[in-house]
């Protein structure tokens, strides 16, 4: 069966119908993003004249690096460029500016940076770009007694930047841990009546989710609108950011239209009514990983992977009987169509679709990236088999009514979260010219992928546990901790949020020290953790297509900026 052609139609009989009566339901709402609407998307910003306009504005904006002569000016320019989504356009200029800053700080033994806001901003930007920089010195934020300065001794911008910087902490950086606690307390006490409105909105935004944990592209519009109210921000830079956003959005619309045609022609969801039909949400996840226009192929192929993750997850979580799941897991492990005879029709459809997508992905990676097709397919089949085995373990827990310890839960969850599955697919989809050295890099960074996978799982649990408990799903990490430690849900949630913070520290150890040629892949993996923070922040981003989800999709994929 070719992906893009209709899948087999389900056959039902009285016995199968009897089994269907006992099936569980996820109670997922129908898809709200209809095919005709997606195909109607169009943008004038894919015209060449807007790309030319962006190039002209880009050349004009380069002068800003020359005009920014002092340390604070350089730092704020770099920060603004990153936040409005223009970092890829000014890579060389940003590197040159940060190289100069890092060198001047390293050679200056007089501790010349006295402005606490600048100290924190400098630390954050240097660390997130891979420069070796130690946690802020005690003298920068502590008084002579070794305690943090009182709120009245620090301006709001300084406290806010200290808060943001604290989220780039590594393990054992106790000063930054104290800085996070201190700045969080201060920011929560800030009154809107006594704080400039634009700054107050930034404080609220940061407390909802810190910048380091946010998906950069998802926040671009918010930052542009925020900077528009700041008279110190150069208008040319903001004009460029708006045009760039619209040009990128035009490419994303074309990507989405193409993948929606594939999805409709596939016909998979019509035969699997129990599963989530979430094409647009799946595509948006890939946009969160890498949004630049030149990565259209990556987004389209990885969207197919995300779609299959959702479908197979629903097979294990919601619909399949334990006996069926055993046969399905065996079939995936052996990757053998001979196993299909023991599978019900809906599982045959899942297996054949996955089999075809995986084969076509490996073939495409050989054509586009010069990876060995057989080698690629071997790696992809392995991560799918690992994923299904982990889901089967959780299905057995559910069927036995078993609640594991948190440690036992996480051992399986790091695989069932799909983090490693997405990492391996991303590796082959994004990296060029497969070599042993590159594959060694994949193996060498397993610890980072492991920590990102656990962030994915725990964020998922925090966002979906209420709905899962209502459905009677298997125990989440929240329930596991509640029962293991005999605590209430609120305490369990607080504990797991702390664990997420610790895993981020482990990720921080690895994600700022990679070589330039590997940095894109590392960024994609870190963005996986950021995407799930966005998806499951106070909601189930896949299960429920609520107002917040719809608003974000319309903003990022449908509505362009109005240009002056």
Curated annotation (Swiss-Prot):
Positions contributing to Mg(2+) 2 binding: 313, 317
Record motif DDXXD motif, residues: 313-317
EC number, UniProt record: 4.2.3.46
Any matching Pfam family: Terpene_synth_C
Chain residues that bind Mg(2+) 1: 313, 317
Recorded GO MF terms: alpha-farnesene synthase activity; magnesium ion binding; sesquiterpene synthase activity
Matches recorded under SUPFAM superfamilies: Terpenoid cyclases/Protein prenyltransferases, Terpenoid synthases
BP terms from Gene Ontology: diterpenoid biosynthetic process; sesquiterpene biosynthetic process
Domain comment, as recorded: The Asp-Asp-Xaa-Xaa-Asp/Glu (DDXXD/E) motif is important for the catalytic activity, presumably through binding to Mg(2+).
The protein, known as: Alpha-farnesene synthase
